[in-house]
Amino acid sequence: MLTIYNTLSKTKETFKPLDGNNVRMYVCGMTVYDYCHLGHGRSMVAFDLITRWLRKSGYALTYVRNITDIDDKIINRANENGESFDALTARMIDAMHEDERRLSILKPDLEPRATDHIPGMHAMIQTLIDKGYAYAPGNGDVYYRVGKFAGYGKLSRKKIEDLRIGARIEVGESKQDPLDFVLWKGAKPGEPFWDSPWGPGRPGWHIECSVMSTCCLGESFDIHGGGSDLEFPHHENEIAQSEAATGKPYANAWMHCGMIRINGEKMSKSLNNFFTIRDVLDKYHPEVVRYLLVASHYRSAINYSEDSLRDSKGALERFYHALRGLPRVAAKGGEAFVERFTVAMNDDFGTPEACAVLFDLVREINRLRESDVEAAAGLAGRLRELGDVLGVLQLDADEFLRAGAEGKVDAAQVEALIQARLQARADKNWAESDRIRDQITAMGVVLEDGKGGTTWRLAD
């Protein structure tokens, strides 16, 4: 039985879909003004893991993750670059998809873009105005009336009276209350705009997600997710808009993933510790990065450091060494490991405990590989099967263990030396065999002799 920590109730709850076996999940995606950073990667991988386990558990999942393709940051960056906002967003969307491909992230079922849902935003805003939850001061802007919504703060546990302390209305704003937030922004000179009943302008950030989620999944759906930094004000405002407009509960469960810390500090451009996904993947194997992101519980903060990456690489090497040299066959045996893995994942997607099961499975494979190759191979298939839930262990073992060899050693030369060494051993020329092995070792290559022959990998 699957339990999920619901940020709304601040407790773990038994997961009960609203519609039988069908599950509808919406996750806040990228604002595409720049390359994805590690924090985005954290959210991408976390909800990819959740997607994989829901489907593995037999649920019929519809996974929606939006793209915010109009925003102040996008407009500012496009102006800095001297390009149109849509040219910038198209380029960044392509880059995002490439990052996801390298991290083995499955595509969402739907990936709505804000600019494709402008009419729906007009309709929801008008509904809010008609119900008294929003107002148009006459300058092209439309604001949400926060004080009108009785449930404001129920997600973040923030109180309106506390929020009002220090809140103020900025110059140029026409709010009735400092806490009110914008639903529609009147057009400014030189900015992209769309016609609306309140004049030309563009949507506010929060209304975009309310409209895209309900358009794709209905007025009420099962799971709404995102990074913990979105809990307030973004997700709080989504609830206020959506429930005021529809009169129905918005999302049944709210899930938030933890943030990335760099060497124990918050990731920040000002601290010069800001990394894009592509920067990291150019330096480290994508599976090493993915395992780092998935091995910690999705709600926990992750510390990104050389040490943590080294630990991630070491863990994967242990897994792949267990797979190496065994025939690739269907999973067989190991039902007790599957049961433990299932218990861990059903407890709010408990990946630390699930990964511990994989290490125990590796020990059993290694115990059997010399005495019962068939049983070891079946368990190796099981290791790959469970690894697939985490999005890892699908590569050829030698391919992973040799990763990074390109540009460091000549693979053809290594293979030729291995053949020469094999011939020397066949000729019982042990001195020549040892000399060749020493030559290969000096190249930074480790040889491993086994029943299936000699394989090699780069030294750590």
Swiss-Prot record:
Motif 'KMSKS' region: list the residue ranges.
266-270
Tell me the enzyme class: ligase
Q: What's the cofactor?
A: Zn(2+)
What EC number(s) does this enzyme carry? 6.1.1.16
InterPro entries annotated for this entry? Cys-tRNA-ligase, Cys-tRNA-synt_Ia_DALR, Cys-tRNA/MSH_ligase, CysS_C, Rossmann-like_a/b/a_fold, tRNA-synt_1_cat_dom, tRNAsynth_Ia_anticodon-bd
MF terms from GO for this chain are: ATP binding; cysteine-tRNA ligase activity; zinc ion binding
Q: Which residues bind Zn(2+)?
A: 28, 209, 234, 238
List ligand-binding residues for ATP: 269
PANTHER family associated with the record: CYSTEINE--TRNA LIGASE, CYTOPLASMIC, CYSTEINYL-TRNA SYNTHETASE
Name of the protein:
Cysteine--tRNA ligase
| Organism expressing this protein natively | Pseudomonas entomophila (strain L48)
